[in-house]
Amino acid sequence: MSVRLKYRDMNHLIKKASVCLMALMILSVNVMAGGNATKSIKTSSMNWNPVMDAIIQVESEGNSKAVSGNSVGAMQITPILVKECNKILEKQKSKKRFSLNDRYSVDKSKEMFLLIQKYHNPENSIEKAIRSWNGGIKYSIRATNRYYKKVMSKMK
């Protein structure tokens, strides 16, 4: 009887340990995925840093206070893009939302860029990322050619 009880206790302990281990693994994945955008600039295996840095150089020469019409910040983000990011976050059941003032933050601007790429560019196409940043999701190749070449020339 006592051997059987010990076996049952051991099984119970193993099950509890397995559940705890799984919870820790899930928690660590969530922590890594939910970090600051500048620390986690990769979406899947794509490193968007060179693209974002080149876009920043073309859009504002690195000036986070740049203003041109409705576009502001280092990445020249429009209110429409902020709205699109918030729609994506809502669809993902996230409580996070971007404000219009977030456009002046380079880190928040990069977060918005990454969110747009993850949602609208899951194939991680650099060309699509650059052209759509300039011409919108339904960009025209002809209309975005000059911009695309400019950004590509700034990439390191």
What are these regions (language model features)?
Residues 1-2, 20, 109:
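Solvent-exposed, charged interface segments at domain starts and junctions
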Residues 29-33:
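Sec/Tat signal peptide C-region and signal peptidase I cleavage site
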